Amino acid sequence: MVTNKKDTDENRDVQGSIVTKTSAIFPVLVGFRVINSLLTRTYFQADEFWQSLEPAHYKAFGYGELTWEWKVGLRSYAFPMLFEIIYRLVKLLAIASKEALSIICSIGAGLMLLCFPQSKLATEVARDLLTIPNEYSETVEYYGVIYAPKLFMALLAATGEYFTIKLIQKVYLKTVSKNDDQLPKLSNITKIALLLTLTNFFNCFFITRTFINSFEMILTSIALYNWDWSGGIEINTRSFTKSLFFAMFACIQRPSNAIIWIVLGFFLTINLLLRRDYTLIGRLYAKILVVFTITMLVNVVIDFYFYNQIIFPVFKFINFNFTSILSEFYGVAPWHFHLLQSLPIMLGYSLPLFIYGLFSNDSTTKNNIRFGALRQIKFVLILNIIFYSYLKHKEFRFIYPLQPLFCLLSALGALKLAGKVQNYRYLKEYVWIIPLMSMIVSIFITTFQESGVIQVMKDLHNEKDIDSVGFVMPCHSTPWQSYLHRNDIRQLWAISCEPPLHLLGKNNASIELQTYMDESDYLYENISGFIKKNFPKFTNSMDMENVNNNASMPQFPHEWPQFLIIFEQLDNEFMSRYLLDSGYVKYNKIFNSYSHWDSRRNGDLIIYYKNN
């Protein structure tokens, strides 16, 4: 096929217009998300830490804890490896700062002793100067461990939103009527898209958190922008090659992402078939094969680095989450969960705009292709929602990779609606109220709601001379070494919740799964019985050392720790009475949440202390 020169020129005009209108947006996005990330100091779900920061910390610093997924090779290491790199850079910075300060402080101490050789004060000052490098280096390393991943995620988040806005511009320019005055409306839709993405409640709450779903959304937004929306004209371009790479990389990390690209690939193939361009179809699938091979090899190398063997976590992920019933171990939601809960929460105040954009007639399609960009996007969204609704285990974040397309239809809906609403200038004076309220709510939740489980790990890091710490609460209720960052604690443990992996492949797995209980289940089914069975009994004559270290006593799964950390719900229900005369005292109480969907996590965090 000979590419139409007019079509090619139009594509170049589209790219030029997009560059012009987005040149100043990226710094705004970065600045906004940096503030967003630094304000985020609350807990949402365990995967934010245990599937990204914890394996990275384990690899970079040589200590920590890995969940069962990493022990059986269910997860790809590609996303955590980014944070390992960040951690290693932090280590280098800490070492460099220590060396630089050591030289400076040594010179200062030497001069002090040289000038005042008989002074006790000078000797003490010189001694104190020599301790500064170690203390400063440890401080630099700890703050780097906490905040460097946040800043990195802010940069990634801004990148994802930047390409989302460019995608919206690109699709808009490819679908508007040729008779429209494009540039004024392009400016308007750019402003609308920027407003929608920055003030979206779920974006502010979620996008800078270290979830694989955030990374998946960012990869998806880059791939969608570089996708061939022209019906085949751009297949031979570098841009389309980039799209394939980022799309396939996203699919390897999260196989469910493939639904997006199967639909788009189907429409691209159909458009080429309708034009009878069989040569280009051959080139398309040849390029797909080559890019897939390269992408898979890159990921295999990354996973080999972590697992020390050639492994394909993507297949184990599919087996556990899609072809077995074990994913239901983590909860089952009704079929309408995403329709009635995920979409309203993810879209927020832009939900009416999205619905309007979804059901609006498609604009005139350029390049005379049968299935235009908007029609394809609507199919992608509908089929993905159907697919995710079919899965029994559902979470809001599973559909987060669709956020660029949600934003696209919302922005187009807002642009169309703005032209039809009367007294628009009057409404314009008040339209900022709803986005502002959305941001206020998100700031409150990211700053306060469930902040205690993060703060307690920071407090433990700063505590001196810790012998042992135990968390008696639902499993993975806190981060681990990614916030504690200490390798000098003799015993550090928490209640576990291992899934029944022995049921994989069993015919009666669905029946046995219903009766399976993990350690957390046993704890809350019978708190008194669990404590008495798994911990040594207190007696008035015993101190902590006798209870935990007497070899003649029967051994228990858990020992009573120096620091015992529980939720207020457990304290009120059992622990406050049981620990009377045990030697434990309430050491601290940290605010965690005003209310919680999980009653086991209600209230503040209670820290008990007993000196060994």
Swiss-Prot record:
Keyword Transmembrane helix appears in the UniProt entry: yes
One Pfam short name: Glyco_transf_22
Subcellular location: Endoplasmic reticulum membrane
Enzyme Commission number(s): 2.4.1.-
Keywords: Endoplasmic reticulum, Glycoprotein, Glycosyltransferase, GPI-anchor biosynthesis, Membrane, Transferase, Transmembrane, Transmembrane helix
A Gene Ontology cellular-component term: endoplasmic reticulum membrane
Keyword Nucleotide-binding recorded: no
Glycosylated sites: 188, 321, 361, 508, 526, 550
Membrane-crossing residue ranges in chain numbering: 92-112, 145-165, 192-212, 254-274, 288-308, 339-359, 371-391, 398-418, 429-449
Family, as annotated: Belongs to the glycosyltransferase 22 family. PIGB subfamily.
Protein name from the UniProt record: GPI mannosyltransferase 3
